[in-house]
Amino acid sequence: ASLGATVVGTATSAEGAAAISDFLGEAGAKGEGRVLEVRDAAQIDALISHIEKRHGAPSVLVNNAGITRDNLAMRLKDDDWDCVVDTDLKAVFRLSRAVIRGMMKARYGRIINVTSVVGHAGNAGQANYCAAKAGVSGMSRALARELGSRNITVNCVAPGFIDTDMTRVLDEKQREAMLAGIPLGRLGAPADVAAAVAFLASAGAAYITGTTIHVNGGMFMG
């Protein structure tokens, strides 16, 4: 929004969507919040149709929805696997597919998928989440090859440990152990991730596609 884009953000509840609309309005930005359950294909189609009618075809898509249902593999239920993969991988494909036609017509597009450091490094107790995020990385490279001739780039941003509500509940011992594995010695800020996403959406990244920007303070280098 700070770069002048019209932003349509989604949330799973009406309250969340209203909060997005309020945030954009207070910032003087164009856009709105909308309710979306990303596992519902009909809702995805309805959302893209609404955006096209009200704002024009999307030129930038940021896939940032994600959930976890952690457990050791031997205890992981099929429903926990399916729910995470449907949300974190299948929905990314569906949303990407929904905007590709408009981007191809415009001969311009930016698809940016937020993955995770664990999709590259792995993490015990998160086989479903790791598989989904690794799948998004592979899919992104495939789409980059498919769509490059139409001036559509597809890239990933892979955050490490970010200072959010999820990490703030850790006790001091857990926090120290986490920081010990990060060469920069601190958690990332949401703004660090946002900056990488904004860069990939900018003209400065026009010749970058099929790659991943790692935002993890050095905890994974590859």
PLM regions: where:
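Residue(s) in the substrate-gating loop at a strand-loop-helix junction
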Residues: 116
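Substrate-binding pocket helix/loop in short-chain dehydrogenase/reductase
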Residues: 72-73, 77-85, 178
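Active-site helix of classical SDR
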Residues: 96, 132, 140
